[in-house]
A protein has these predicted regions:
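Nucleotide-activated sugar donor-binding and catalytic core shared by glycosyltransferases
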Residues: 1-141
Length: 141
């Protein structure tokens, strides 16, 4: 997997984020789509109403596979399957490649579902969340 990621990062239009790049926000603002494994980033990116690709072909750590798969299921949010509907699932690299092309050509294909689940998770998506927090804090000193 590492070799494949390093190969992709050699392209001029690809930036492979390092572990030290812990904040995804700057990348989300400029990205056309998100490719992710099972991550909360899927939900966060959906709020931007941009295509999300779920890479389901990456190998989990050994202690989450086989007879230990219950650990992974226990760790994941109980509602995760419901929210997986906002992403296009890719079970192989070949499928991912096709899905990237399709989602770039049709970025609004899952727009309604993305916005539905983003509103369910984050509430009103009008850009005024900070203002509402400040107003609440000022009113409830």
């Amino acid at each position: 997997q590492r070799q494949l990621l390093e190969h992709w990062s050699s392209y001029d239009n690809v930036y492979l984020a390092k572990v030290s790049d812990y904040s995804l926000v700057p990348f989300m603002a400029t990205a056309d789509l998100l490719m992710s494994d099972a991550s909360s980033a899927i939900i966060e990116f959906a709020a931007l109403d941009k295509p999300v690709l779920w890479c389901n072909f990456l190998k989990l750590r050994w202690n989450y596979r086989g007879i230990f798969s219950y650990r992974f299921k226990k760790r994941m949010d109980k509602d995760y399957n419901e929210y997986s509907k906002i992403a296009v699932r890719s079970d192989s690299y070949k499928m991912l490649k096709n899905n990237v092309q399709d989602q770039i050509a049709n970025p609004k294909a899952l727009s309604e579902k993305r916005l539905h689940y983003a509103n369910k998770m984050a509430g009103t998506l009008d850009g005024n969340a900070s203002k509402r927090i400040i107003d609440y804090l000022l009113e409830n000193k």
